[in-house]
């Protein structure tokens, strides 16, 4: 029976990096995962020649140059900038919520105008201390944006009305009073250029005992 220094549960980024560094330090690692594949939530599968993210798009982002250089030893990353948009009955809005969103919604141009509009709608809703997700969202971005871009999506995502969801879920919602459409503020960001996330994980785990290699 083989003896290991570490049993690593989970073959996602954290487990793969730990196993890689432990192996470099001369340790024996066994990596296990309940899923039938490695790479955790960054797992991709090829469909018609395209690497599709099974669990939703995952973009690597960091402000740490050393971390960026570290991951680039396993794959070359492109400079993908995540600038999503939402389509509400033919109306296109930028995400995360920023001045482009507010301008499209209300015709406002300056941050002061946008903040005044949000405050007006918060006051009209009579919200002082948000008690649920709906009230928290209105406090952050106003009633119009909540009704068009948050209510339906979030209710579908969680399977219950926003009035039944706790306020803390949306407290970290990015709201920017600039015209920057970049979802992340990180200096370094991207997706592996020509290889899948699975290939990145395989390269990280290549000297370890792990599933599906």
Residue ranges and their predicted role:
Residues 39-40, 50-55, 207-213:
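Central helical "cap/lid" subdomain
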Residues 91-93, 100-213:
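Active-site/ligand-binding neighborhood in enzyme catalytic cores
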